[in-house]
């Protein structure tokens, strides 16, 4: 590990994505230390400010199909070299929720998901034992998309699967976290950072290159 046990990763995607639930804003980033999510970060694919191709009455009042969202089906890449130690499949991609009404109903079932095991929380996911130390989780992958097997070695940029909306997810996105052991129910979360990416200024202008950092909440980033 590097200074402060910080795992340095590459962004696990191509194109522009918005950082959400960032540890640059607060720790624990997801409001809890449970399931080793202490320093986890979420990324949502965007084009400009839009995360979906369509916005209509369902966006405001109901649920939406995940295929509407730009992230759905996008390749998710290995952010570090290492060995795949866990693959979980078999979770369905459920409907997405941007509506406040749908989000309230979904929040009421949170406790049930927390007791439902790794699949109910992380959905379809891959865990990589990173060569530099730590275990990297890529969560909420698309049903049937995972392309790696347990025991397989992967290089940086190796395609693991596709972004989906499985598990505890309100819209298609990829969740990334690093742990000190492969079991999220007993592991501790470890700090992470990303190398070699660009940040697109919210007011426009030329993207700013970052050699090593943690994307701020709401920052739109893309790999160099």
Q: Model-derived features: where do they sit?
A:
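Non-catalytic extracellular/periplasmic "stalk"
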Residues: 1-69
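Acidic, glycine-rich catalytic/binding loops that coordinate metals and/or anionic ligands
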Residues: 4-5, 28-30, 118, 152, ...
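A residue-level detector for short acidic-glycine micro-motifs
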Residues: 21, 45, 86, 140-143, ...
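Short, small/polar residue-rich loop motifs at catalytic or cofactor-binding pockets
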Residues: 70-72, 121-122, 146-147
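Generic structural motif
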Residues: 74-84
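Zn2+-dependent peptidoglycan hydrolase active-site motif and core
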Residues: 83-141
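Short histidine-centered loop motifs in beta-beta connectors
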Residues: 134-157
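Short hydrophobic beta/alpha edge segments that flank linear recognition/processing sites
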Residues: 155-168
């Amino acid at each position: 590990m590097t200074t402060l046990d910080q795992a340095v990763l590459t962004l696990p995607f191509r194109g522009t994505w918005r950082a959400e639930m960032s540890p640059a804003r607060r720790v624990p980033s997801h409001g809890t230390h449970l399931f080793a999510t202490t320093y986890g970060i979420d990324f949502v694919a965007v084009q400009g400010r839009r995360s979906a191709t369509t916005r209509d009455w369902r966006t405001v009042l109901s649920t939406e199909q995940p295929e509407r969202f730009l992230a759905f089906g996008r390749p998710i890449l290995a952010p570090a070299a290492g060995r795949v130690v866990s693959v979980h499949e078999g979770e369905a991609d459920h409907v997405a929720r941007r509506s406040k009404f749908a989000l309230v109903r979904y929040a009421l079932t949170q406790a049930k998901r927390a007791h439902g095991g790794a699949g109910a929380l992380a959905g379809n996911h891959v865990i990589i034992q990173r060569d530099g130390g730590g275990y990297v989780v890529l969560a909420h992958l698309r049903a049937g998309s995972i392309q790696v097997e347990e025991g397989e070695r992967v290089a940086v940029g190796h395609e693991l699967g596709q972004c989906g909306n499985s598990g505890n997810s309100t819209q298609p996105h990829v969740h990334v976290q690093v742990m000190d052991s492969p079991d999220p129910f007993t592991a501790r979360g470890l700090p992470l950072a990303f190398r070699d990416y660009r940040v697109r200024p919210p007011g426009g202008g030329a993207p700013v290159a970052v050699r090593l950092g943690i994307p701020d909440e709401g920052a739109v980033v893309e790999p160099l």
